[in-house]
Each structure stands twice: as C-alpha cells, then as structure tokens.
C-alpha cells in the first residue's frame, strides 16, 4: 500500500482531482483508501484510509493501527468521512492474475485505482500481481508504464532480495 501511494504521490499527473465545485486541480497529496478482510465475516471486507507520509516507518505504524481497526469495524466503510484526495487500492488475495479488466461506469475522478492480487512463487521469485485503472484524460501509456516500473523499483528498494 505504501509503495503504491508513494509512487502516485511523486507525480502530479496521478494526483488530478475535482474539488467540491467540480473544478479540476492537482491534490498536494493522495491518501490510500484500501480494502481489509473483516474478522467477523471473512468473505466481506472493510475500507479504510491511512494518511500518507513519505516516511515508510511512520506510515507502517499508522497503517498497522488502521488495519487492525478496519478488521473489526463490522461494516464496509470504517471512516465516518473520507478526505476527497484518496487513491483506491483493493486486493483480491485469492487470485494470482496475469491480466484484469475493469468494467462498469467510468470513475468520476482522475486518481488511479490499483488492484493487488495473490502473492505467489514464480520460479525463484515471489510475485505480487498488480493491475490498475487510470484516467486517460490525464495519464497516457508513458505515465502508466512509468507507474508500474517505478512501483517495481520502489518495492525492490524496500524489500531487497
């Protein structure tokens, strides 16, 4: 979650959004809004926001507290109110996918939505599938491929072999 948010926050083209009046602008930062499996109903999940900080250790401490709260909140939305500047991160921990397609209506905002799959071994490596939905109005192929490349580099620095 931190790696995704860190990469998105490094680049203005991933932080486009709309204010309450519908005006387009660039957020100073995005906070990850992510899914957490619920303890009371393992087939359901809860959604939680953790305020982003570029300091990994500080973020991890907040994330662990927020995650524990979300596991036991007993409902879909753990936060009473959400900041407008969030980036969605969801997980499908039971699926080791190689491709994924989002369907439905386009999102009304411009922030990316990132999907994480099942961590699994692949030869001598451990793989975490990652997919994403990006608004073509503000992100083109170069931005998107750059996101995935930088995400891989960020994770490799944080979790060296």
Question: Residue locations for each model-derived region?
Answer:
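Acyl/amide activation-and-transfer machinery of modular secondary-metabolite enzymes
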Residues: 1, 28-54, 127-133
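Hydrophobic "lid/gating" helix adjacent to the active-site nucleophile
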Residues: 1-32
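Helical lid/core segments from catalytic subdomains that handle acyl or acyl-like groups
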Residues: 38-97
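Residues in well-ordered beta-strands of folded domains
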Residues: 17, 33-37, 48, 64, ...
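Short, conserved, surface-exposed binding loops centered on an aromatic residue
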Residues: 24-26, 36, 78-81, 106
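Flexible, Gly/Pro-enriched loop and linker segments at secondary-structure and domain junctions
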Residues: 83-127
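Active-site-proximal acidic secondary-structure segment that organizes catalysis
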Residues: 10-12, 57, 69, 108-161
